Amino acid sequence: MAVALGPSGWWQRWRRRLSAREVSRMLLLLLLLGSGQGPRQVGAGQTFEYLKREHSLSKPYQGVGTSSSSLWNLMGNAMVMTQYIRLTPDMQSKQGALWNRVPCFLRDWELQVHFRIHGQGKKNLHGDGLAIWYTKDRMQPGPVFGNMDKFVGLGVFVDTYPNEEKQQERVFPYISAMVNNGSLSYDHERDGRPTELGGCTAIVRNLHYDTFLVIRYVKRHLTIMMDIDGKHEWRDCIEVPGVRLPRGYYFGTSSITGDLSDNHDVISLKLFELTVERTPEEEKLHRDVFLPSVDNMKLPEMTAPLPPLSGLALFLIVFFSLVFSVFAIVIGIILYNKWQDQSRKRFY
């Protein structure tokens, strides 16, 4: 038998429900803030960042390298450990890479990289370093820190070994950046100097505290900063305006060793979407591009390779070449006979 509740009974029940609802909302808010999914204001002005989990990687690295559903792929000698992902061990002639499977279509973003480089080698007897990529192609092994040469996109290099002889202008390890449209080669013998956008010294080997690198791309402005002093403070390294990067490229990181070696470890990669205000003029200027470039920096234009000839086209070329050759021979014989006839008439 149902018991009727008076006005005071309904009020008490409604108040209890309201309290439970409010508690649930507060718990949900705390969970979101604790997981990093909520927006966070960064810098001056109306700029907020949102963690994008589909482009981020952190411990415990579940499924990386083993599951087909993982958002990240391993390549080469890269291996998953409990506390980090090792791109290359401290052994000669190794290379490895870690690539995101999801293309990034964000307009403005910030990538925070937590890494560690360490090994047994003494001064200038270690190498070669690691690279962070935002490129059109992924999973393409090659000579540029374990990735393909003539890449299309952005490469940021943490170079630990000076290849150029009599190098006195810069101290290694050295961070540099390069934008490529697929037409440029990375010059190992000169440590990439002919094509670099800028760089700075970064003493990152065999440190006993965490080392971080951040790559920020906002309003076609590329900024690279580092936190390598154990002070939890970002220090400027590279700042380049007018950098045009297409959307839909892939994030990755790679490393390579040669005669010299090091352990190259990645602890985490965290990508944040940055929301920034744009004026109508900026909206017009910041339209999507289809090929990487840098304002006021001339990159060689890509020349499309000629398409291969079809079988019919090749047959026609050979056929008409033979016809032309036969025609030329016949004309030559006729002219020669006429010349001989004229020569006989002169003597008789």
Swiss-Prot record:
<dbReference type="GO" id="GO:0046872">
    <property type="term" value="F:metal ion binding"/>
</dbReference>
<dbReference type="GO" id="GO:0030134">
    <property type="term" value="C:COPII-coated ER to Golgi transport vesicle"/>
</dbReference>
<dbReference type="GO" id="GO:0005789">
    <property type="term" value="C:endoplasmic reticulum membrane"/>
</dbReference>
<feature type="topological domain" description="Lumenal">
    <location>
        <begin position="39"/>
        <end position="313"/>
    </location>
</feature>
<feature type="glycosylation site" description="N-linked (GlcNAc...) asparagine">
    <location>
        <position position="181"/>
    </location>
</feature>
<protein>
    <recommendedName>
        <fullName>VIP36-like protein</fullName>
    </recommendedName>
</protein>
<keyword id="KW-1133">Transmembrane helix</keyword>
<feature type="binding site">
    <location>
        <position position="159"/>
    </location>
    <ligand>
        <name>Ca(2+)</name>
    </ligand>
</feature>
<dbReference type="GO" id="GO:0000139">
    <property type="term" value="C:Golgi membrane"/>
</dbReference>
<feature type="topological domain" description="Cytoplasmic">
    <location>
        <begin position="335"/>
        <end position="348"/>
    </location>
</feature>
<feature type="disulfide bond">
    <location>
        <begin position="200"/>
        <end position="237"/>
    </location>
</feature>
<feature type="binding site">
    <location>
        <position position="161"/>
    </location>
    <ligand>
        <name>Ca(2+)</name>
    </ligand>
</feature>
<feature type="binding site">
    <location>
        <position position="163"/>
    </location>
    <ligand>
        <name>Ca(2+)</name>
    </ligand>
</feature>
<dbReference type="GO" id="GO:0005793">
    <property type="term" value="C:endoplasmic reticulum-Golgi intermediate compartment"/>
</dbReference>
<feature type="binding site">
    <location>
        <position position="93"/>
    </location>
    <ligand>
        <name>a carbohydrate</name>
    </ligand>
</feature>
<feature type="binding site">
    <location>
        <position position="163"/>
    </location>
    <ligand>
        <name>a carbohydrate</name>
    </ligand>
</feature>
<feature type="binding site">
    <location>
        <position position="128"/>
    </location>
    <ligand>
        <name>a carbohydrate</name>
    </ligand>
</feature>
<keyword id="KW-1015">Disulfide bond</keyword>
<keyword id="KW-0472">Membrane</keyword>
<dbReference type="GO" id="GO:0006888">
    <property type="term" value="P:endoplasmic reticulum to Golgi vesicle-mediated transport"/>
</dbReference>
<feature type="domain" description="L-type lectin-like">
    <location>
        <begin position="49"/>
        <end position="274"/>
    </location>
</feature>
<feature type="binding site">
    <location>
        <begin position="258"/>
        <end position="260"/>
    </location>
    <ligand>
        <name>a carbohydrate</name>
    </ligand>
</feature>
<comment type="function">
    <text>May be involved in the regulation of export from the endoplasmic reticulum of a subset of glycoproteins. May function as a regulator of ERGIC-53.</text>
</comment>
<feature type="binding site">
    <location>
        <position position="191"/>
    </location>
    <ligand>
        <name>Ca(2+)</name>
    </ligand>
</feature>
<dbReference type="InterPro" id="IPR013320">
    <property type="entry name" value="ConA-like_dom_sf"/>
</dbReference>
<keyword id="KW-0812">Transmembrane</keyword>
<dbReference type="InterPro" id="IPR051136">
    <property type="entry name" value="Intracellular_Lectin-GPT"/>
</dbReference>
<feature type="transmembrane region" description="Helical">
    <location>
        <begin position="314"/>
        <end position="334"/>
    </location>
</feature>
<keyword id="KW-0479">Metal-binding</keyword>
<dbReference type="InterPro" id="IPR005052">
    <property type="entry name" value="Lectin_leg"/>
</dbReference>
<feature type="short sequence motif" description="Endoplasmic reticulum retention signal">
    <location>
        <begin position="344"/>
        <end position="346"/>
    </location>
</feature>
<keyword id="KW-0333">Golgi apparatus</keyword>
<keyword id="KW-0430">Lectin</keyword>
<feature type="binding site">
    <location>
        <position position="188"/>
    </location>
    <ligand>
        <name>a carbohydrate</name>
    </ligand>
</feature>
<keyword id="KW-0256">Endoplasmic reticulum</keyword>
<feature type="binding site">
    <location>
        <position position="161"/>
    </location>
    <ligand>
        <name>a carbohydrate</name>
    </ligand>
</feature>
<dbReference type="GO" id="GO:0005537">
    <property type="term" value="F:D-mannose binding"/>
</dbReference>
<keyword id="KW-0325">Glycoprotein</keyword>
<feature type="signal peptide">
    <location>
        <begin position="1"/>
        <end position="38"/>
    </location>
</feature>
<dbReference type="Pfam" id="PF03388">
    <property type="entry name" value="Lectin_leg-like"/>
</dbReference>
<keyword id="KW-0732">Signal</keyword>
